[in-house]
Amino acid sequence: MPDKPTKEKLMEQLKGGIIVSCQALPGEPLYSETGGIMPLLAKAAQEAGAVGIRANSVRDIKEIQAITDLPIIGIIKKDYPPQEPFITATMTEVDQLAALNIAVIAMDCTKRDRHDGLDIASFIRQVKEKYPNQLLMADISTFDEGLVAHQAGIDFVGTTLSGYTPYSCQEAGPDVALIEALCKVGIAVIAEGKIHSPEEAKKINDLGVAGIVVGGAITRPKEIAERFIEALKS
C-alpha cells in the first residue's frame, strides 16, 4: 500500500487524467454479495491509463487496494432516513475510511439536513481536527455549497451531486457552468457527474479542473447499453 500523497503530489498525478468510479449497489447487475467484481473494473481502468479510482465501501476499497496502487477516492454510501445525505454522511463512515489509508475521503457537503445535525462547515472542521493529514473531497451540488466547503478547509470540491438535489441545476449532462464557476474562484475542482463522453471530458479538462471522475459511462454496462438502445428509438 503506497504512502498517502500530499495534495500537491496528488494534483500532479490527477492532472489531465481520468479517475474511474468503480461502484455497484445492491439491485444493480454488477453488484455481488461476495465481492470480486469492482477490482476487475479497477484493473481494467488501470490498464486503460486511469490516474485514480473512486470506490464505495470498505470491502470494495480493500479489494481494489489489493490489485492497484492508484490513488483511491473512497466513500461509504449509507442511508440515514429521513435525512437525504448518504455519501459518507457521518463521522462513523469517515472513521472507517480513514483506517484504510486511502488518498482522499469524499463526503456529502450539501446544505441538506444531516443525520448528525451539524452544518457542513462544522462537520468539515471536526473531520480535519480528527484526521489532519487526510485529504478530503466535498461532494456538492451548487456553487454556494462548494464555496462553504472550500472556506471550511476542504481540499477538493466535487460537482458530484449537481442534479441530485432538488434545488440544483437539473441537466442531462455535466454541470459545466458550475465546474467553470468554481474553477474561476481558485477552487481545486474534481468534476464529476453525468460526464458521458470523451468530448465532454476534454471540454471540462480545458476549464482547469484538478481532476475528472467518470463512472457510469465506463463502469455501468446496463447504463451504457441503455444509451445505445434509446438512441435507436429516437
From Swiss-Prot:
SUPFAM superfamilies with a match to the protein in the record: Ribulose-phoshate binding barrel
GO CC annotations, alphabetized: cytosol
A molecular function (GO) term: N-acylglucosamine-6-phosphate 2-epimerase activity
UniProt KW Lipid metabolism keyword: no
Top-level taxon of origin: Bacteria
EC number of this enzyme: 5.1.3.9
Pfam family, one: NanE
Record pathway: Amino-sugar metabolism; N-acetylneuraminate degradation; D-fructose 6-phosphate from N-acetylneuraminate: step 3/5
Reaction(s) catalysed by this chain's protein: an N-acyl-D-glucosamine 6-phosphate = an N-acyl-D-mannosamine 6-phosphate
Key words, A-Z: Carbohydrate metabolism, Isomerase
InterPro entries, per the entry: Aldolase_TIM, NanE, RibuloseP-bd_barrel
Gene Ontology terms: biological process: carbohydrate metabolic process; N-acetylmannosamine catabolic process; N-acetylneuraminate catabolic process
Function: Converts N-acetylmannosamine-6-phosphate (ManNAc-6-P) to N-acetylglucosamine-6-phosphate (GlcNAc-6-P).
Recorded family membership: Belongs to the NanE family.
Protein's UniProt name: Putative N-acetylmannosamine-6-phosphate 2-epimerase
Source organism per UniProt: Streptococcus pyogenes serotype M5 (strain Manfredo)
